[in-house]
Amino acid sequence: MKYIIGIAVLMLTACSSVPDKAYYQLPDVYQGANNKVVTTTESAKQDQIWVQPIRLSDMLVNTGIVYQTSDINYTVANQHLWINPLDQQLQQNLVVGLAKEFPNRVVSTQPIEDKLAKLTVNVNYFQGRYDGKVIIAGDWIYTQGNKVISQPFSVVLTQTQDGYPALVRTLGEGWQNVVAEIAKTIKSQY
């Protein structure tokens, strides 16, 4: 009898399925952007913006997409994961977006010269929310010479469809808004 029960349990567990993991990357909102190649001799003549690594709050430093389930509860998805670390995706989108906005400057993740502008971005919230909203918030600091610009940012967008793919697309749109606002503020000051 124990043998039959064991086989039945084994058969039932073999038939159950574990949901597949889905991997996501922020959309390439800058497709077709002018991604010029700058040689070393040309870059020495242009001002540089050094985009430092994005700093994420602790809840965002994981592979799962963060979702706020109530006014005080958060969950990190186990089946819906970032294909590449979120900080790297955000930094790459920021570099490409700023390069588009500043075509006469070198925008890079590495310092190329001693005289450069430095951009540091902290992301505290980058998630979907129970009411269909997408929240992106944090702050950034831009230093160039003796001048320092420090600004918070907060973007709240409505997710137009259900599901993680729509959430990731809306997060990408929100990040594009943050990049545009950073570029606009820098341009207005210099």
Roles of regions detected by a PLM:
Residues 46-115:
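N-terminal segment of the mature soluble domain
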Residues 48-53, 66, 118-123, 135-139, ...:
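Soluble periplasmic/extracytoplasmic beta-strand elements of cell-envelope proteins
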Residues 17-34, 100-146:
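Surface-exposed short loop/turn segments
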Residues 73-81, 147-177:
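Short secondary-structure boundary motifs at beta->alpha junctions and helix caps
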Residues 20-23, 27, 31-38, 161-190:
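C-terminal/domain-edge helix-coil "capping" segments
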Residues 12-14:
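C-terminal motif of bacterial Sec signal peptides marking the signal peptidase cleavage site
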Residues 1-8:
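Sec-dependent signal peptide recognition
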Residues 32-52:
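N-terminal secretory signal peptides
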